[in-house]
Swiss-Prot record:
Annotated InterPro entries: Cytidylate_kin, Cytidylate_kinase_dom, P-loop_NTPase
Residues engaged in binding ATP: G10, P11, A12, S13, S14, G15, K16, S17, T18
Keywords: ATP-binding, Cytoplasm, Kinase, Nucleotide-binding, Transferase
Keyword match Translocase: no
EC number assigned by the record: 2.7.4.25
Cellular component per GO, a single term: cytosol
Gene3D superfamilies from the UniProt entry: P-loop containing nucleotide triphosphate hydrolases
Protein name (record): Cytidylate kinase
Amino acid sequence: MKAIKIAIDGPASSGKSTVAKIIAKNLGYTYLDTGAMYRSATYIALTHGYTGKEVALILEELEKNPIFFKKAKDGSQLVFLGDEDVTLAIRQNDVTNNVSWISALPEIREELVHQQRRIAQAGGIIMDGRDIGTVVLPDAELKIFLVASVEERAERRYKENLEKGIESDFETLKEEIAARDYKDSHRKVSPLKAAEDALIFDTTGVSIDGVVQFIQEKAEKIVDMS
């Protein structure tokens, strides 16, 4: 049976990662959290006080402490920068609020996209992000673009933060998500947009199981036809 490449794109908190992880597990595919990679680069910049003018220093740190993933005992994914477990650190609000400008740096995107493509070569992979279907994996057999209302996405992020013990304010989250949408869709390099051949799916009011079922049925149909 042919293993395909699945690209899931969409704005912040549209459910990409949650859905991608479940589908990867169901299909026995590799899940690559590209967002965690950009968050890791952001964490480096914030930790060292680097600005957008110091891209070379950020890349140097990434070379010294490469990003890699491990599985925890409970099956969840851990993110490392060299020897440092940054799984929780990269989900903090300061990282969330700064990841857009890091993602917009051409040199950072070029390096991380190179890494992502290398990992995806063999197929049997599912990636989620902002530009997977348009830039990273334009040859992906299945491209999905998830959308949802700002209100619903803020509610999801609020619940996630509570579960992780991160203090949050719902109204502030709404403002931050709307601001990030604007930044992501208006940046010069790899702006957030659906690929021309992507299936656009509005997840507002749809359960996680419902979204998983929709994508998985499409994937299985493509595999059966190939």
